[in-house]
From Swiss-Prot:
It comes from Arabidopsis thaliana. Residues 1-35 are annotated as: Disordered. This is Probable transcription factor At5g41765. Pfam families: GeBP-like_DBD. The keyword Iron does not apply. Signal peptide: none annotated. Keywords: Transcription, Transcription regulation. The keyword Hydrolase does not apply. Belongs to the GeBP family. Residues 1-13 have a biased composition (Basic and acidic residues).
Length: 152
């Protein structure tokens, strides 16, 4: 993904002396998803609409369907890894914006792709974080139940 110069100073634009040096800071409006990621998500929704099958149930069919949307040749294991990374990005984003999870578009995408209820996934991840923070206290125990799957 091409990134624009994130530290373009007014001096450089107005003809001032000196060269702007990148600071490595992210701009507020910087994109987090590439066009390939967006196309893959759109094609998953199209797959669900056309075949009435969940992409997570029919991974081979989803791969064959999505293969036409993706411009590069990939193997099925690479496709599965890409879907896992998209899932991780989506869960992380939903964890940050934890207000009213069930009505968001990200929640619907997560249910469509992985059949997990977003609220239970976020609760599960928060539980894992709590477990990591309290590993020095063996007397504290947590319920290690997996997130709930939704029936679509």
């Amino acid at each position: 993904m091409d990134k624009a110069n994130t530290n373009r100073s007014k001096k450089e634009v107005c003809g001032g002396s000196g060269e702007a040096k990148p600071t490595g800071k992210k701009r507020k409006n910087e994109r987090t998803l590439t066009n390939k990621n967006v196309n893959a998500k759109k094609s998953m929704m199209d797959f669900k609409a056309l075949t009435r099958h969940n992409p997570s149930d029919d991974m081979t069919g989803a791969y064959n369907f999505l293969h036409e949307y993706i411009s590069v040749d990939v193997y099925s294991y690479e496709f599965v890894e890409k879907m896992k990374s998209l899932k991780k990005k989506l869960i992380e984003k939903m964890g940050i914006n934890a207000k009213d999870l069930s009505s968001s578009i990200g929640s619907e995408l997560l249910k469509l792709i992985w059949r997990y209820d977003v609220k239970s996934v976020v609760e599960y991840n928060l539980l894992k974080i709590e477990q990591a923070n309290f590993t020095s206290h063996p007397q504290i125990s947590f319920n290690n139940s997996e997130p709930k799957k939704t029936n679509l």
